[in-house]
Amino acid sequence: MSFPEGKDILLMGNEAAKAAEAFQRSLKKIGHRRTQSIVGDKIITVSETVEKPTISKSTKVTTPPERRNAWGEKPDTTRNQTEEARNEATLEDTSRLYEEVFAPTSDGKTPAEEGMETPEKPKKKVTFKNDESGRYTKLEMEALELLSDNEDDDAESSVLTFEEKDTSALSLEARLESIDEKLSMILGLLRTLNVATAGPTAARDGIRDAMVGLREELIADIIKEAKGKAAEMMKEEAKQKSKIGNGSVGLTEKAKELNKIVEDESTSGESEEEEEEEDEEESNPDDDLYSLTM
């Protein structure tokens, strides 16, 4: 038995590949045809085309079944009539609403425009009117505003200082306005003082007594504080006297001994120096500058 050689095996493999490709192509086509290989040789394929069966379409029209109630009653025949009536009613209602919304009122505005307007603020039920009758009411109000001004919150506010405001135009009118403002302020202060002191006699006496009592309390507090300081100074002086004595300073026994030793040493040193100087003068009498030789 002879085995095939390598060339024969390669040829058989190529033919098998070509046959497989032809079979795949034949499946994609509708009818049975003979295909050709890449080389050009005709190859008879074993594939057979199977024709698709024709599906007969029925021309019968199927109608949906009618709805029936569970209790076997007949369907309502008046449903279509009610739907038509409802549609007509909705059209009439919408037209009526359209006329009501867009119909102008007596003011010439439609209700929609009136609704878009901003609502008015509620009016106050009680209104307080300032009684402006009088000659100095305006000045009095200005003075009260100045007196009620809180200087702690506003560093620039001051009741008792009258500094001119920084005006860009240094004209005569600006100066007159500033002078008028100062005068109105002064008159307002005088008016408030007049009102405060123009009460009955009992009220004025009460104010005076209160001021006098306040003054006496302040004086008593000052005197009390001064007396307390003086008493503290006297106590401190007494403590110092008890420590020092009569004011004379005395030495202790050890201090006295040390002082005596120091004094002895100082006196002995001075005497020795004096003796040495005398001996030198006696030994050298010719060294005197004032001695003259004839």
UniProtKB/Swiss-Prot annotation:
<feature type="compositionally biased region" description="Basic and acidic residues">
    <location>
        <begin position="253"/>
        <end position="263"/>
    </location>
</feature>
<feature type="modified residue" description="Phosphoserine">
    <location>
        <position position="158"/>
    </location>
</feature>
<feature type="region of interest" description="Binding to the N-RNA complex">
    <location>
        <begin position="281"/>
        <end position="294"/>
    </location>
</feature>
<keyword id="KW-0693">Viral RNA replication</keyword>
<feature type="region of interest" description="Oligomerization and binding to RNA-directed RNA polymerase L">
    <location>
        <begin position="169"/>
        <end position="194"/>
    </location>
</feature>
<keyword id="KW-0946">Virion</keyword>
<feature type="compositionally biased region" description="Basic and acidic residues">
    <location>
        <begin position="65"/>
        <end position="97"/>
    </location>
</feature>
<feature type="region of interest" description="Disordered">
    <location>
        <begin position="234"/>
        <end position="294"/>
    </location>
</feature>
<feature type="modified residue" description="Phosphoserine">
    <location>
        <position position="168"/>
    </location>
</feature>
<dbReference type="InterPro" id="IPR003487">
    <property type="entry name" value="Pprotein_pneumovir"/>
</dbReference>
<dbReference type="GO" id="GO:0044423">
    <property type="term" value="C:virion component"/>
</dbReference>
<feature type="modified residue" description="Phosphoserine">
    <location>
        <position position="157"/>
    </location>
</feature>
<feature type="region of interest" description="Binding to host phosphatase PP1">
    <location>
        <begin position="123"/>
        <end position="128"/>
    </location>
</feature>
<feature type="modified residue" description="Phosphoserine">
    <location>
        <position position="171"/>
    </location>
</feature>
<feature type="region of interest" description="Binding to RNA-directed RNA polymerase L">
    <location>
        <begin position="251"/>
        <end position="279"/>
    </location>
</feature>
<feature type="modified residue" description="Phosphoserine">
    <location>
        <position position="106"/>
    </location>
</feature>
<feature type="region of interest" description="Binding to protein M2-1">
    <location>
        <begin position="135"/>
        <end position="157"/>
    </location>
</feature>
<protein>
    <recommendedName>
        <fullName>Phosphoprotein</fullName>
    </recommendedName>
</protein>
<feature type="region of interest" description="Binding to monomeric RNA-free nucleoprotein">
    <location>
        <begin position="12"/>
        <end position="28"/>
    </location>
</feature>
<feature type="region of interest" description="Disordered">
    <location>
        <begin position="52"/>
        <end position="97"/>
    </location>
</feature>
<dbReference type="GO" id="GO:0030430">
    <property type="term" value="C:host cell cytoplasm"/>
</dbReference>
<comment type="subunit">
    <text>Homotetramer. Interacts with protein M2-1; the interaction between the two tetramers is required for the anti-termination and elongation transcriptional activities of protein M2-1. Interacts with host phosphatase PP1; this interaction recruits PP1 to the inclusion bodies. Formation of a complex PP1/M2-1/P allows P to target host PP1 phosphatase to the M2-1 substrate. Interacts with the nucleoprotein N; the phosphorylated phosphoprotein P binds to N-RNA complex. Interacts with the monomeric RNA-free nucleoprotein N.</text>
</comment>
<comment type="function">
    <text>Plays critical roles in regulating RNA replication and transcription through its interactions with multiple proteins. Tethers the RNA-directed RNA polymerase L to the nucleoprotein-RNA complex. Recruits the M2-1 protein, a processivity factor that is required for efficient transcription of viral RNA. Acts as a chaperone for neo-synthesized nucleoprotein by forming an N-P complex that preserves N in a monomeric and RNA-free state and prevents the association of nascent N with host cell RNAs. Recruits the host phosphatase PP1 to inclusion bodies to regulate viral transcription.</text>
</comment>
<feature type="compositionally biased region" description="Acidic residues">
    <location>
        <begin position="264"/>
        <end position="294"/>
    </location>
</feature>
<dbReference type="Pfam" id="PF02478">
    <property type="entry name" value="Pneumo_phosprot"/>
</dbReference>
<keyword id="KW-1035">Host cytoplasm</keyword>
<dbReference type="GO" id="GO:0003968">
    <property type="term" value="F:RNA-directed RNA polymerase activity"/>
</dbReference>
<comment type="similarity">
    <text>Belongs to the pneumoviridae phosphoprotein P family.</text>
</comment>
<feature type="modified residue" description="Phosphoserine">
    <location>
        <position position="148"/>
    </location>
</feature>
<keyword id="KW-0597">Phosphoprotein</keyword>
